[in-house]
Amino acid sequence: MSEKLRVGILGATGMVVQRFISLLENHPWFEVVTLAASPRSAGKTYEEAVGGRWKMDTPMPEAVKNIVVMNVNEVEKVASTVDFVFSAVDMSKDEIKAIEEEYAKTETPVVSNNSAHRWTPDVPMVVPEINPEHFDVIQYQKKRLGTTKGFIAVKPNCSIQSYAPVLTAWKEFEPYEVVATTYQAISGAGKTFKDWPEMEHNIIPYIGGEEEKSEKEPLRLWGKIEDGVIVPATEPVITCQCLRVPVLNGHTAAVFVKFRKKPTKEQLIEALRNFRGLPQELELPSAPKHFIQYLEEDNRPQVSEDVNYEHGMGVSVGRLREDTVYDYKFVGLSHNTVRGAAGGAVLCAETLKAKGYITKK
């Protein structure tokens, strides 16, 4: 066994977990040693537990096929085998909150893909290029939990990855009002067209809970730590509509922005191309070299051309132009199960390791 950190994944048979497993194959720092799921999957090998439901383009990694799935509710037992866990469990919000805290209290850091703790005041919700300083709130969370090493960190909703990084890159121009419509892939619901044939040739103009997340979560990313909790920003005000569209992977957003300090188009494009964050400075294993690309062509970004930009960890932007009602409008695209889910969580874990929050037990 190498000096890699031992990783457990909670919720082991779902689509996001499959993406975690694919991304962590041959990872230089992390090694998946434990998979935990519901009692009905426990005791089976991972290959048996998933059955014919492997949904990735690449085959199931050999290294995980014969891992015997543990019962996610046997917290002490699972925690004793790992240095930290990724959480992508399918339970009620209250159950997720409780089980993630139970894991943290065993001195096991939890990096969560779930929404349950996104508004817990002392839990950092982080996109590492945008707000890595929010990890500083962990010291206060540990006091509340009574832990020395255990804590919970979360990543935000997949829908905001196509525009929150862009607005962050434009912060100096003070965006204060934003209108967005997102066009979200079916893999965001954990589905493929085989599972959800009624989505072919169809658009559904509603995704439960998604609009509120899309409006509020960016403000938490841009917030500040005060008195041991994260206080969200109040601007820009965002209004959003979220549509489910017949695309397998990739969330697209059409966005309109007003600025207090109206820039030129050239200034906006330059800000996108120059935008770098901590993961780029630290050259973390999963970090895109260039987080945001700007495409000049009128017909880009396109899902078929651009969703895998920087292995799905980058954001593609195009069609930036002045608007008749707002100052500017643009289209953004990101990969919802890579940057928007498992890949974003892996990058959070890499950042936490680099900052000394996750270590060997």
For each of these PLM feature ranges, what is it?
Residues 2-205, 237, 315-316, 320-323, ...:
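N-terminal Rossmann-like NAD(P) cofactor-binding subdomain of oxidoreductases
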